Amino acid sequence: MGKENLYVWEMTPGMVHENDAAERLLALCGQENMLRSETKEGKIELTAACDGLFRVDSQRLIAVNSREDVMIATRKGNTAVRKGDKLAGMRVIPLIIKEETLQAAEQAAGAGPLLELLPYVKKTAAIVATGSEVKKGLIQDTFTPVVKEKLAAYGIETISIAYSGDGVENVANAIGEARKTGADLILCTGGMSVDPDDNTPGGIQASGARIVTYGAPVLPGAMFLLGYFEDGTPICGLPGCVMYAGATIFDLALPRIAAGVELTRRDFAVMGEGGLCLGCKPCHWPNCPFGK
């Protein structure tokens, strides 16, 4: 072992061994849809048991990690993970820790798990491709295939594609027909800019959706729109950058939407920090700072 001395630890009242302490830290994290490792050298790790959205209660995690002699490290929250991905690791710093110190960490954690892994629940989507030039066949629809591929990565099947043309009424009517398909998610492509004939935002509003945000502090993707219908069905207006950029606001929002999380305006506001794509060549998304 390379050691001149061997040490024997004897149980002392009021002290907790690192292995037992790690189990208690694990209990704070939660394990639904996650798999734990064996306790090794005082450390336990969590991995994903399914594809889904990994979420972290950041403020409570900070509260725990602010206590003395304990640590829980996680991957970034609100990110998509695959089955088998590493999610978190936890341990205490010393070999043995005071019971009162461990209890202080438990109290700081409060009620409920610090971590959660939400499986994707949205299974079907309907796409409304706007623009008269697409409807008339003057240009090829290169937007829809990109969106379908992004949806498929989260297990979402595209069950309907409609070409609305221009005009608020035309877009609204096409959205109404898309809703009749029973799709879990509706996506409108194009027509999201400031030109007079960009009527997609108006069409979405006219369709009866409650608009959460039109615009987001993310580049590329500033002209993104998200709304919800009364039954909870989300609808997105996708700007043209989704068609050609490696990663956009849609890639940040889609995992949450697919997991059934209802986003708020504040959710988008906090995306501003880290919301600037650096345009790296080649693109390394999602292994990059964008959206982190």
Model-identified regions with their sequence ranges:
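Short glycine/threonine-rich loop/turn motifs
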Residues: S132, I159-G291
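Solvent-exposed alpha-helices and their adjacent loops that cap or buttress functional pockets
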Residues: R36-T39, T79-V81, E116-V121, R179-K180, ...
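Glycine-rich phosphate/diphosphate-binding loop of Rossmann-like nucleotide-binding domains
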Residues: A111-D166, N170
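Short, compositionally biased
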Residues: L25, E99-L115
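Glycine-rich, charged/polar anion/phosphate-binding loops
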Residues: G30-E32, I72-R75, A108-L115, A174
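Generic secondary-structure signature for well-ordered alpha-helical cores
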Residues: K3-E4, A27-M34, D51, K83-K86, ...
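Structural motif
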Residues: E4-Y7, M34-R36, K43-E45, D85-A88, ...
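Phosphate-interaction motifs
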Residues: M1-E100
